[in-house]
């Protein structure tokens, strides 16, 4: 029989307290420490160069290594031998299936598992994995976000092997990193344009490096990500439908204690969390992910994981893999990992700092100062060209990290503002100022950590490691790299890396052209370089800001400087379709106008769908949880007032009931507001849903639905403070954030 409404309410209330009690009783899961040292089991499940050498013929091995290290074209004829070696290793490791593992425009990863088995022609089965299966498969392209490039009736798409990212084993499946493209050749994923952007920056940077060292043959873009996340007990998570459906809390009043004591950051890691981290690190190392750092973050139940930096494409694959691994391992420890940028209002959200740099095959970090004047001219050249790229494409870089989820975090006085600028620090700023203002070709002399000797009387010796840590800067120079801090915790790093590497590649090509033009006119090489650099420093001065990015004064100043100050995410996406953006991506060979248009359609559509889901969930919770609970408590208060009137004289009863009458009225007002605005929000959605343009529909959701969510939440959070705690069915912030 269906339980009565009263019985159902009691069950809901009991559920909250049961899951809290159960969570408190949970013990840390015991994690066995491997007998081997980490260096011995590192990359155990990866078909890396060591495994390639063992399982491939030497000719095939050399050809594959040449393709991986130097980008040499890979002859399709060797694919069968690579597949045979890969299959032999995988079967020895207990693998039964394989999959092409790719990153469609959904922000996550996709895979379809096929068994190795085929008919042997004799009524039995045999293990089979050919070069054709390794190199290419045909997933249904119309079933993934494609921005209109693929229709359901023309669904063919291809996933194609990326040899530069090694295959790996998860459970019983061999995962082969691949790109995903339409039948007509357009990229439908993140990896394909990322590889093109990395190739473009390699070529452009090598050309510029030849001014300083003709021996340079390859430049590699490096990425070191810092993954922030929250952990919530699985029982508490399940009792919050908003967390379950959207990844964030759509309601919930601040806990009396949150992060104001600053006692969580770098604090002792809770026992259950430490066990989770230990298992996660072991699994990550076996998959070749060089995890190094773990610690508590600022907010309660917020943590961070960071690896050693790697080549950008591989680092990005590893980040996608670690996010998948975190979700899986957390459940074994009774947690759910929250990768949403802002799961809880009132405490810090989560980001994913992207530490980006360029390095040569001769062992030089191009963003690091050197020991000779020539080295430091090279250093300044690459730093200033990066600033030029960020200046001319600051709107694009903002668009590359913008999303419905990251919008809650950016500019909230806890994360970088939604205006792209670059922090350089006092030392580097002085160097650039000197070059800008000098009238002769003074070469800068920096001697690394021993001190920065500038051979310039008016600038004293400085320590290069003394770059300040301006946490309010979205793109900060940190000694030998730039740290792109605006990237969201849930994002695919490739989006930001495609934009940044493409912009830098385009800028370096322009620099080479400008310098060569002066050299052709008879200008000495060093003078030509410094003259162009001097002009660039003046041109991109607006992007340099070392002050407080949280201040209102900076927003006004940024607007005066002509930087992109737009705050509407759907409008920010327009930066992808500006003529200068399209020209840049086409000049570097990274994406065509058609691909950019398709991606923007996906971005607008995804934005709309995420806000739409949040609106539906909040509406359901408001009508099915909040209003019934508040009304029930209101009824208890009304009954109390009537009993007071029957027990006491009218005047005394009125006095004793005054507060309850105020609460009754407040509950009535707030529930009426919630009901009225939920209904209005439903109607606003219906109006927006009729808009055919994905861009205009996303803007309508931003302008009407997002503010409605906040208004409804405000009144729900006020009711949470009024209603009897024993009646409130949903776990509160104090339980979600402090039960570990």
Q: What is each PLM-predicted segment?
A:
Residues 78-82, 102-104, 132-133, 180, ...:
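Active-site-proximal loop/turn and secondary-structure-junction residues that shape catalytic pockets
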Residues 155-339, 348-354, 358-601:
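Glycine-rich, acidic/polar active-site loops that bind/position phosphate-bearing ligands
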Residues 107-124, 142, 240, 247-249, ...:
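Short linear, low-complexity motifs centered on an aromatic residue
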Residues 538-740:
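C-terminal amphipathic alpha-helical interaction region
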Residues 12-56, 211, 218-236, 241, ...:
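Active-site-facing alpha/beta catalytic cores
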Residues 24-131, 135-151:
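Histidine/acidic residue-rich metal-binding segments in metalloenzymes
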Residues 78, 102, 130, 307-309, ...:
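Active-site proximal loops enriched in glycine and acidic residues that flank catalytic Cys/His/Asp
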Residues 1-14:
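Single conserved hydrophobic/aromatic residue that forms the stacking wall/gate
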